[in-house]
Amino acid sequence: MKPTILLYDSGMGGLTIYDAIRQTLPNAHYLYCFDNAYFPYSERSENVLIEQAVKIVQKIAEKYPLDMVVVACNTASTVVLPALREKFAFPIVGTVPAIKPAAAISQTKTIGLLATKGTVERPYVAELIEKYAKDCIVEKIGTTTLVELVEEKIRTGNVDQDRLSKVVAEWQTHPTLDTVILGCTHFPLVKQELQQLLPNVKYFIDPGNGIANRVSALLSESVPEEPEQNKENIAFCTKIDEEFFKREVIMQQWGFKRLELLNFL
């Protein structure tokens, strides 16, 4: 049997995690939900994030037997994992800022955490820094603007360079910053633009490969001799808006057969 893996995020940034997992497990069956009715998650309360996580996973699991859920969002992962693991028997993998590898690789021991405001302010992240980067200076930028810029790039192919530059302005002249953690699954999609704006930064760290390895370790993938029926990769959204058909084309380009509305009624 092909393992069925559900990934979800508030937007399409989690596609960076999907892409990393797909390269490791190309024959798995993928479902992807972006919770656009509650985008961006960084502006939602912890209770709302937990409620949405349970509703999304429950609804999709009713129709598709799931082998794994990947919370492809840093902000949600700092909050929802205990609730999901308590309710569901299949493995739940989260996405957290790659503070440990960043602290290990930084030569100047000066790290930048680029994430959403919600992620930057979570006590969980402070605990990770205390545990793995105690000997480092950790500079933080919490931004919702960059999430919006990435969603715009996904839809149009264009990036507003002026707005992007303003987001990281305080780091552009930083004398010792050599490592930046891309602490939101959206941000690897503007890695090249960030490299141009921050030429003194040697390392940009994102969690994609680490998560792919973790998922692979938890799943034993078996490739069937005959193609399985009814195993199409399907994407879901939680609200239909004027961008629906454009998003459907984008999801098809990423290997999903169609985009459906996830109806909770």
From Swiss-Prot:
**What Gene Ontology molecular function terms does this protein carry?**
glutamate racemase activity
InterPro entries attached to this UniProt entry: Asp/Glu/hydantoin_racemase, Asp/Glu_race, Asp/Glu_racemase_AS_1, Asp/Glu_racemase_AS_2, Glu_race
Pfam families in UniProt: Asp_Glu_race
Q: Which reaction does it catalyse?
A: L-glutamate = D-glutamate
GO biological process terms on file: cell wall organization; peptidoglycan biosynthetic process; regulation of cell shape
**Any idea what job this protein has?**
Provides the (R)-glutamate required for cell wall biosynthesis.
The family classification in the record reads: Belongs to the aspartate/glutamate racemases family.
Please report the name of this protein according to its UniProt entry.
Answer: Glutamate racemase
This chain's source organism reads Actinobacillus pleuropneumoniae serotype 5b (strain L20)
Taxonomic classification: Bacteria, Pseudomonadati, Pseudomonadota, Gammaproteobacteria, Pasteurellales
